[in-house]
Each structure stands twice: as structure tokens, then as C-alpha cells.
Amino acid sequence: VSGVDDYNTTADDNHICDLSYQYNETHITIQSNGLPNHDFHSGPGCCASAQDYSWTLPLTPTNDTDCDPDLATTGCEMAPERGPIAISVNGVPFFGPEDGPGGDAVAGNEGAYEEDRQNVWLGLCHGHSGPNGVYHYHADANCVHWHVDESAGETWLDYSINSSRSGSEHSAIVGFAFDGYPIYGFVGWDENGETKEITSSYRLKEGETGYNGIEDYEYLAGIGDLDACNGRFSATPDFPNGTYHYVSTFVNGEGGTGFPYFLLCYRGEAESGNTDEGGGGGDDPDCSGHGETWGPGIGPPPPGCGGGGGGQGQSSENGIASIPWFKAPPDSGAILLSLLALAFVAAAGLRGSAYPAVASGRAGTAL
């Protein structure tokens, strides 16, 4: 498998994106090293390095009954202002809009204000690395699906966010939130089944620029396509009967910034323990309690532990190439769609697409 390069170094880095997983009847635990499947920029926080992530997500999301994001974020669990809020299909964490100084990193990167507190800029796919070499995305993340046409002399530097925004087909899943709901790319279907860029319903408050981060924005229901969490219920190629899902947005319904870019709150009940950078670390995990506190029909394994004995609890070998192929989305929960997405990373190679082409109608995925 061909590795990828960090454009902030002079060396041929040959970084390898690596994932493995275990699952049982209720949860899936994904281990990743946090390195992407595409070339990237570490940015001022150079340089990105392999991490030890373990993310646990529910196979079947459960709505938070206290949360009504059509109205506001009141009653909803807010995504962390710093650190991971979701996971990409390549195992790289999604962060919220704010970066170290407290400003909206995406708005600053797009020239909405001058960041004078710290040197912050975003590279390919609006990602960069932070303290301890933690690579992450603040927006976009559609690099996981983009093809480099080497015969035409292309490199990853030819990737353009507009190529992901102007597609004639429904976008693929780019990741999953910690409540188990999928996150799609920019393009979705309108009420007539036609493709369009999906827009945020947030806008800057009068006189603000994003310099103060989240507090500079207000939710105004109806100006865009999405609710206060940056999600909606609608049909997708993977769920022709409809599902709640979040959308990676780059503009709002008025043509302004697409804050919050991924999600601001969780419509479902988010799994605890994922927001501390995936529970990674160097200590050996405590795997006691199998059959009593965790295991098939009981709950997910502790981070870093295998799936346990028998039943539907399963474990993969290390390495992304071990992820299996599913011809159609499995019935055992929405989150297993991530395995299908990750299988394409393995099947097509790390420099190829991480997901299949999808049909432009509402009938489903064309495989």
C-alpha cells in the first residue's frame, strides 16, 4: 500500500492510514492511528504523527428526547468546543470550528478576519495538526473520496473544495458523529430528488466576523436546509427511506460561511469517552469483565480490548486492508456503513476513492 506525504516536511514521509475494529450486537469500536489516506499539510503545528485512538459508537442511534434541534440547541448535548466531535471514515477526528486562540479557524482561513493571536492556517481538506501531532479536520474532509489523476500529472495539491461542492451526485458519507449518525458531504437531495448543495442555518451576528468563535454566530431556522445541530432527516443513497444525518457545510442559506461545518450538537445520545481524543494512550487497557460488564448482548469492549469470545462480537486483524467488503448496507445498524466506506479505502488503495460512486436519484447506491 502506498503511503502519503506531509507537505510541511522535506522528507518522503510515507505515512500509512491504519484502522481496525471490533463490534457486537450494540456497538462498534474503531481503532485508528489518526493519519489520513491522502497527502496533507500539518500546518504550523507540524508535524502530524500516529496516534492511538479507540472510538466506540452505537450501531443503532437513539434520539435524545430532550433535544429538538429544529427549534434550538436547548436541551441538546453540545459538541465539545475543542477536541474530537466525530470521526472520519479514514479514522481521522473531526474537530469543531474553534482552534487554539478561540476563533473560528475556518472563517479565519477563508479571510473573514485576521487571526493576530496565533499562527493558524488550514491545509488540504481544511485539516492540520495540533499539539502532540494530532491531525484533524475543521471542515470539508471530502479528500477521502477524491481521486488523483496521475496520468494527467495531478497531485493532491490539485484538490479543490469546489469539486466536492458542485457534484451532480449525492455526496457520500464522510464520517460518523459520536451518537452514531452519519455525516455526509456537501451535496444532497432537495424535496424533488434533485441534487443541490446543502446549506447551514447559522449566520454571523451583526458586526461579527468569527474572531470570537462560536459566540459570533446565531441560528435562524429556515435560512438554510439544516437544523441547529447541522443535521436533517431525509433520504440518502444509503437510506432511501430516510435517516437523520449531519452534513459537512461550507455555506449557509444566505451565501455566507457554512458554520459549524460539521455539527454543533448531537441529535442522538452520544457515547461518552470519545471526546477525550479517542481514549488513546500508551497504557495497557483493563479488559476484565468480559461476559459480566461487556461482551455480546451486554455492551462494547473497553477501548483497546478485543471483541471477546463467540457470538456477534468480532475483531479484525490490524491494518486497514483487513476491513471486509459489504455488497449492500448491513442490517445491523447505521454505523456499519462505515465499514463499507472503509472497505473502499482498502480496495481502491489509499490514494484512491474511499467510497463508491452513488446514483443521482433516490433509488439508492449504484454498485
Model-derived regions: residue spans:
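Core of folded catalytic or high-affinity ligand/protein-binding domains
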Residues: 89-95, 99, 103-156, 178-179, ...
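C-terminal membrane-anchoring or membrane-association module
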Residues: 343-367
